[in-house]
């Protein structure tokens, strides 16, 4: 790691103003791009984007990746290429700490899929720091969510769900025994925009998948989708008329909509409801809430709102 004792953030330093944007989501990426096109191109600022991923996919598309309806390679934006085209620098890494006195963002080491280190710990000096790292899944302390449910926050998670869905269908198609109740049941916990859109997309995608030769699976009988929401209605942040229209549409597709239903636990067996019922489910998606990343709580002097709990 660079020597943190050096006054790298000193206002007396020479050279262009250093702007570091942490987080390459929609907001952070657009900001880095615009700053690069205006200030970076003319040498008036040194713009750096930091992200733990190597490419960007617009988050509202993740439900389509999960359903297998969208080819990620056709929609991802490579950070290195974007940086080259728009006059900023990309750093592969994740924010783990902040030295505000010396104006240094601390980046943790990164590793590949086999556990080999790709980049060491580093210190990224800045004059202006923008934190745009977005949110992470909030399981509200519900037992079993981390072990038995798949969130949809990243491309990797969406791809993981899609692989498990494909494997579940192939298993059902080739097994000798009859398809068991709940075997091809997908339970989606959380009926905000992500959960609701996923339910509709899965209905279409699974029936298309079965049409490609999986003749042992009856989509109307064997493929079950359940959308679970603790609030009195789905899409609770939207006007009630839209919620009612979406409910009617989903139920018309055969999706079981369970509003006003609380989840007490998720196990290998399925979803346990607060009223004692158990929904046997082969796949469980958790889209019930978000919170600020844990690193925000470790940044000295940063004021937090209630969403970071």
Predicted regions, residues:
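Flavin (primarily FAD) binding-site architecture
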Residues: 136-145, 290-302
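Active-site acidic short loop of glycosyltransferases
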Residues: 126-127, 268, 280-282
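A conserved beta-strand/loop element that lines the FAD pocket in flavoprotein oxidoreductases
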Residues: 87-94, 254-266
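Beta1-alpha1 glycine-rich phosphate/pyrophosphate-binding loop at the start
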Residues: 2-97, 193-238, 285
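Short glycine-enriched, charge-decorated loop/helix-capping segments at active-site entrances
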Residues: 62-68, 146-150, 242, 300-302
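FAD-binding core/adjacent interface of flavoenzyme oxidoreductases
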Residues: 2-16, 88-187, 285
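Helical element adjacent to the flavin cofactor pocket in flavoenzyme catalytic cores
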Residues: 80-83, 243-257
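Conserved small/polar residues in nucleotide/adenosyl-binding loops
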Residues: 307-309
